[in-house]
From Swiss-Prot:
Signal peptide region: none
HAMAP family reported for this sequence: DeoC_type1 (MF_00114)
Claim: Lyase is one of the keywords in the record: yes
Gene Ontology annotations of biological process type: 2-deoxyribose 1-phosphate catabolic process; carbohydrate catabolic process; deoxyribonucleotide catabolic process
Catalysed reactions, as listed in the record: 2-deoxy-D-ribose 5-phosphate = D-glyceraldehyde 3-phosphate + acetaldehyde
Residue stretches in coiled coil: none
Pathway membership: Carbohydrate degradation; 2-deoxy-D-ribose 1-phosphate degradation; D-glyceraldehyde 3-phosphate and acetaldehyde from 2-deoxy-alpha-D-ribose 1-phosphate: step 2/2
Name under which the protein is recorded: Deoxyribose-phosphate aldolase
Active-site residues from the entry: D89, K151, K180
Functional description taken from the UniProt entry: Catalyzes a reversible aldol reaction between acetaldehyde and D-glyceraldehyde 3-phosphate to generate 2-deoxy-D-ribose 5-phosphate.
Top-level enzyme category: lyase
Length: 219
């Protein structure tokens, strides 16, 4: 399996520098990762650096809390689209979900999907804050609202992806919607476990280390 083509090579920390974003892009080119995932201020830089390559530029929407207004999330998408973003990783409004305001959660996602105009939208449900029932409901709403992927985590919450959560999300969304595992995936064994559980996209900042481990293993 071409594990590199499952990876969104990610740098979202608050103090990420221009130099670090350029390094991220260089690594993505070297390993032919599927995409880089950066905060939206760095979309133009990443797009320019990766021009002419197969590496896509993904960015975050409503990140990391998910609690910004729906119209603001939609505007973030529109702005990032103008600047060359290919994919969007949005955070749901977790508080609305836990308040059982499911219609608002659906509309929030649907407006982002609409603004993206057919580009890939990954919906982060932030599993660390949810019960299993809430994870199922969130995954169902995301699928119904037009998400292309349901994603486990921002990496900024109290926990990241687990095999159990990936399996649960996959069981809800079925085979036709993607599942992205992210948060705490720092070695090849964890990446493989997530893929075996049903993930078909991986968000990681330790992607180079993972690829070197896979190379040594002969994968």
């Amino acid at each position: 399996m071409e594990y590199n083509r499952l990876i969104d090579h990610t740098l979202l920390k608050a103090d990420a520098t221009v130099e670090q974003i350029e390094k991220l892009c260089k690594e993505a080119l070297q390993y032919n990762f599927f995409s880089v995932c950066v905060n939206s201020a760095f979309v133009p830089l990443a797009k320019s650096f990766l021009e002419g390559s197969d590496v896509k530029v993904a960015t975050t929407i409503g990140f990391p809390l998910g609690a910004s207004a729906t119209a603001v999330k939609a505007f973030e998408v529109e702005q990032a689209l103008k600047e060359g973003a290919d994919e969007f990783d949005m955070v749901i409004n977790v508080g609305w979900l836990k308040s059982k305001l499911y219609r608002l959660v659906h509309e929030d996602i649907a407006e982002v999907v609409k603004a993206a105009g057919g580009k890939v939208v990954k919906v982060i449900i932030e599993t660390c804050y949810l019960t299993d029932d809430e994870k199922k409901i969130a995954s169902s709403i995301a699928a119904a609202a037009g998400a292309h992927y349901v994603k486990t985590s921002t990496g900024f919450g109290t926990g990241g992806a687990t095999v159990e959560d990936v399996q649960l999300i996959r069981s809800v969304v079925g085979p036709n919607i993607g599942v992205k595992a992210s948060g705490g995936i720092r070695d090849a064994a964890t990446l493989k476990a997530m893929v075996d559980a049903g993930a078909n996209r991986i968000g990681a900042s330790a992607s180079v280390k993972i690829m070197e481990e896979l190379r040594i293993e002969g994968n």
